[in-house]
Amino acid sequence: MATIKVDVVSAEEQIFSGEAKFVALPGETGELGILPGHTPLITRIRPGAVRIEVEGGSDEFVFVAGGILEVQPGAVTVLADTAIRGKDLDAAKAEEARKRAEETLQNAKSDLDLAKAQSELATAMAQLEAIQRLAKIRSRH
């Protein structure tokens, strides 16, 4: 089967680089699925899980806290604000971040504080959802 080159990069490091049969991720207007030969595309990414189906049928998961997606016929590049490998996701840390964001939301004194708290809450909730999805997939294997 044909493959496509996939790179997932955050400001801190390269998270994934390799060939894939399929990539699924949360685009700005909904879930995107990308196969080799996809039409060129640039879009924003919402916080959530990137699923990379590699050769052999296994999946790699990366949590992204937003960013930009560039698709070319032979390559997919994810430039993430923050990215965490699926195996490195920590439910306790994500839950703590959710609680902190909710507290900040309650005590926001300005529109800027409110917007920041809303963004942090959305990221924490997306991370918790990604952890749950990954746990379900792992329990099937």
Swiss-Prot record:
Highest taxon above the source species: Bacteria
One GO cellular component, as annotated: plasma membrane
Alphabetical keyword list: ATP synthesis, Cell inner membrane, Cell membrane, CF(1), Hydrogen ion transport, Ion transport, Membrane, Transport
Assembly: F-type ATPases have 2 components, CF(1) - the catalytic core - and CF(0) - the membrane proton channel. CF(1) has five subunits: alpha(3), beta(3), gamma(1), delta(1), epsilon(1). CF(0) has three main subunits: a, b and c.
Locations listed in the record: Cell inner membrane
Entry function: Produces ATP from ADP in the presence of a proton gradient across the membrane.
Gene3D superfamilies, sorted: ATP synthase delta/epsilon subunit, C-terminal domain (1.20.5.440), F0F1 ATP synthase delta/epsilon subunit, N-terminal (2.60.15.10)
Membrane-topology descriptor: Peripheral membrane protein
Pfam families in the cross-refs: ATP-synt_DE, ATP-synt_DE_N
Family to which the UniProt record says this protein belongs: Belongs to the ATPase epsilon chain family.
InterPro entries: ATP_F1_dsu/esu_C_sf (IPR036794), ATP_synth_F1_dsu/esu (IPR001469), ATP_synth_F1_dsu/esu_N (IPR020546), ATP_synth_F1_esu_C (IPR020547), ATPsynth_dsu/esu_N (IPR036771)
SUPFAM superfamilies registered for this protein in UniProt: Epsilon subunit of F1F0-ATP synthase C-terminal domain, Epsilon subunit of F1F0-ATP synthase N-terminal domain
Molecular function terms from GO: ATP binding; proton-transporting ATP synthase activity, rotational mechanism
PANTHER family cross-referenced by the UniProt entry: ATP SYNTHASE DELTA/EPSILON CHAIN, ATP SYNTHASE EPSILON CHAIN, CHLOROPLASTIC
Protein name, entry field: ATP synthase epsilon chain
Principal location class: membrane
